[in-house]
C-alpha cells in the first residue's frame, strides 16, 4: 500500500500549481480559439443568442470585466433563478456565461498535462509516435497477439455518478484551492439549473454543453484508473508502457503487460492476487479489452478485482455484468467499427513415409475482421442516404447545391468510410455501401434536374461518378498479406491498416458507438 502511494505521489509531484488569475485574462480564450478547439461549444451556432459560430473575444472581455465586480457571479445566478418563468433569455445568458468559465478552466488545466505528454514522448524516444495516434494502429497489435490468447474480457468502463468524485481526484493533482471552488460551483449550479429545465434522468455526464471540461474530467478519471491498475509495469526495465500518458481519449493506444501483479489497494497491506505471465490490455473510449492466456477462473478473479477496485477506491458500485468473459475461439467482439474474431481453420495434409501414408489434421488460427452490415445500414439510414432496409434514396437537403458539390460530398463520405473499413477481410459490405452512396448521389442529382436516376446516369455516364468514388489520397498504411489455400487455386487477400486516421468523421463515429 505504501509503495503504491509512493509511486502515485511521485507521478503527481510533477504537476505545478495552477495560476487562478489566468482564468480572468481574455488572451487565454484567444489561445484556445487559435488552437482549433473544434469540440468547443463556441464553434457551434448560437442562434438563440444572436451570435455567429465563432465566439467573440470582445464579448469574453466584457464578461471578464463584469466578473471582477464583487459578488457579480452570485447575483447574476440568483437573478436568473428569480426570473425563471419570465423568459428564457436569462437561461441562455447563464448558459453562455458558464461555458465561458468552463472553457477557460479546461484550457488552463490542460496545459501542464499537455506538457507532460510532450516530455513523456521525448523521454521514451518512440520512433514515429504520431503513427500510434491512429486507431488502426491497434489492429496490427491484435492480429499479432490475439492468436496466442485463450480468454477475453469485454469491459464497459463505468464512470462516477457524482461529480464530487471527479473533483476530489482533481484535488489530489492541483494545489489551487480557488480553482477547485470555482469548479465545484460550476458543476453544482449547472446541475441544479439543468434539473429545473429537463428531468434529471435525461442528464448525461458528457453533455453537449461544457463538453471540453467534462472530457478533461473523464480523461483524468481514466488516467487515475489505468495508472493504479497497470502501475507495476513501470517497474520493469525491459517492458515499457506504450501509450499517450495523459489525456488518453485523444490518442488511441495499446498496452502490453507481462508478469503483472495487481495490488488490492483497499487492504492494509500489499496483497498479490495473481501473476499472469501473458496478458494484454486495450482501451478505446468507454470500452476496454483484457486478454489472457490463462484459464476462465483467472479471468473471473480479474473481474471481481475490478469491481472491488472501483468500489473501494472510487467509491461507486460497478455492476459485474459490465465485464463479459468470453472464450476467444467462440467469440467475436465489436471493437472500433469491426467485428473481430479468431477463426480456427482445419486442413488435411497427407504425409508419406516409405510405404506408409497417413493424413494429418493441421489447425491454424487467423485473426478475422468484418464490417457489421446492420449498423452500417442503420447509420446510412439515419443520415438519410437509404431506407432502413438499405434501399438508396435521394438527399433532398442537398438539391440546392451545385452538381460538383453534391458529387464531392457523396464522394468524400464514400472515400472516408472506405478508407476506415479497408481492414475488412470481406469486402461485400463495403461494396454494398459504395453502391448505396453512388445510387443515392445519382437520385439526388436526378431529383434536382427533375429526371430519373437511370436516364440521368445514361446521359452523364457512370464513369464520372466512378471517378469521384474511387479517388484515394496517398497516405501511410500497413499491408498484411493473407491466406494462401493449399488447393488447386491460390487466393490472395490483403488487409490494409492506415496510420493517418486520427479523427473520424461523424458518420464513421456513429458506426463506432452503434451496438
Swiss-Prot record:
Q: Where are the transmembrane segments?
A: none
Q: Which GO terms describe its molecular function?
A: RNA binding
Q: Which GO terms describe its biological process?
A: mRNA processing; RNA splicing; tRNA processing
Q: Which GO terms describe its cellular component?
A: chloroplast
Report keywords, A-Z: Chloroplast, mRNA processing, Plastid, RNA-binding, tRNA processing
Task: Say where the protein is mainly found.
Answer: plastid
| PANTHER family tied to this protein | MATURASE K
* Entries under HAMAP family matching the protein: MatK
Biological role: Usually encoded in the trnK tRNA gene intron. Probably assists in splicing its own and other chloroplast group II introns.
Put simply, this protein is called Maturase K
**Gene of origin?**
matK
Amino acid at each position: 500500500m505504501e509503495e503504491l502511494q509512493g509511486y502515485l505521489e511521485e507521478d503527481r509531484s510533477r504537476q505545478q500549481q495552477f495560476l487562478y488569475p489566468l482564468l480572468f485574462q481574455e488572451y487565454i480564450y484567444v489561445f484556445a480559439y487559435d488552437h482549433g478547439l473544434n469540440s468547443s461549444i463556441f464553434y457551434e451556432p448560437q442562434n438563440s443568442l444572436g451570435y455567429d459560430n465563432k465566439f467573440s473575444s470582445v464579448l469574453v472581455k466584457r464578461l471578464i470585466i463584469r466578473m471582477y465586480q464583487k459578488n457579480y457571479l452570485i447575483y447574476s445566478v440568483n437573478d436568473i433563478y428569480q426570473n425563471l418563468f419570465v423568459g428564457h433569455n436569462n437561461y441562455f445568458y447563464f448558459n453562455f456565461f458558464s461555458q465561458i468559465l468552463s472553457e477557460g478552466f479546461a484550457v488552463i488545466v490542460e496545459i501542464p498535462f499537455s506538457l507532460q505528454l510532450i516530455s513523456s514522448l521525448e523521454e521514451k524516444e518512440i520512433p514515429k509516435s504520431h503513427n500510434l495516434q491512429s486507431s488502426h494502429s491497434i489492429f496490427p497489435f491484435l492480429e499479432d497477439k490475439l492468436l496466442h490468447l485463450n480468454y477475453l474480457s469485454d469491459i464497459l468502463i463505468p464512470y462516477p455518478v457524482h461529480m464530487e468524485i471527479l473533483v476530489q481526484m482533481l484535488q489530489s493533482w492541483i494545489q489551487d484551492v480557488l480553482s477547485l471552488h470555482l469548479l465545484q460551483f460550476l458543476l453544482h449550479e449547472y446541475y441544479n439549473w439543468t434539473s429545473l429545465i429537463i428531468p434529471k434522468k435525461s442528464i448525461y455526464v458528457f453533455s453537449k454543453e461544457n463538453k471540453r471540461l467534462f472530457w478533461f474530467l473523464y480523461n483524468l478519471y481514466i488516467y487515475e484508473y489505468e495508472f493504479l491498475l497497470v502501475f507495476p509495469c513501470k517497474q520493469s526495465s525491459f517492458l515499457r508502457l506504450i501509450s499517450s500518458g495523459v489525456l488518453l481519449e485523444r490518442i488511441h493506444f495499446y498496452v502490453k503487460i507481462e508478469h503483472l501483479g495487481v495490488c488490492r489497494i483497499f487492504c492494509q497491506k500489499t496483497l498479490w492476487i495473481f501473476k499472469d505471465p501473458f496478458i494484454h490490455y486495450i482501451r478505446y473510449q468507454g470500452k476496454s479489452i483484457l486478454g489472457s492466456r490463462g484459464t476462465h477462473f483467472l479471468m473471473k478473479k480479474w473481474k471481481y478485482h475490478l469491481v472491488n477496485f472501483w468500489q473501494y477506491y472510487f467509491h461507486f458500485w460497478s455492476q459485474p455484468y459490465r465485464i463479459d468473459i468470453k472464450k476467444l475461439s467462440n467469440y467475436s467482439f465489436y471493437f472500433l467499427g469491426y467485428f473481430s474474431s479468431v477463426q480456427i481453420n482445419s486442413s488435411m495434409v497427407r504425409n508419406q513415409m516409405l510405404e506408409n501414408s497417413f493424413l494429418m489434421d493441421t489447425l491454424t488460427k487467423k485473426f478475422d475482421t468484418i464490417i457489421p452490415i446492420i449498423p452500417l445500414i442503420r447509420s446510412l439510414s439515419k443520415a438519410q442516404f437509404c431506407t432502413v432496409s438499405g434501399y438508396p434514396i435521394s438527399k433532398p437537403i442537398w438539391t440546392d447545391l451545385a452538381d460538383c458539390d453534391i458529387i464531392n460530398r457523396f464522394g468524400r463520405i464514400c472515400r472516408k468510410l472506405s478508407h476506415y473499413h479497408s481492414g475488412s477481410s470481406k469486402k461485400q459490405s463495403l461494396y454494398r455501401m459504395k453502391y448505396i452512396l453512388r445510387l443515392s448521389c445519382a437520385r439526388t442529382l436526378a431529383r434536382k434536374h427533375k429526371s430519373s436516376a437511370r436516364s440521368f446516369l445514361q446521359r452523364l455516364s457512370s464513369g464520372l461518378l466512378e471517378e469521384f468514388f474511387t479517388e484515394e489520397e496517398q497516405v501511410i498504411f500497413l499491408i498484411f498479406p493473407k491466406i494462401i489455400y493449399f488447393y488447386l487455386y491460390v487466393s490472395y487477400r490483403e488487409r490494409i491498416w492506415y496510420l493517418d486516421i486520427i479523427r473520424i468523421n461523424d458518420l464513421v463515429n456513429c458506426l463506432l458507438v452503434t451496438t
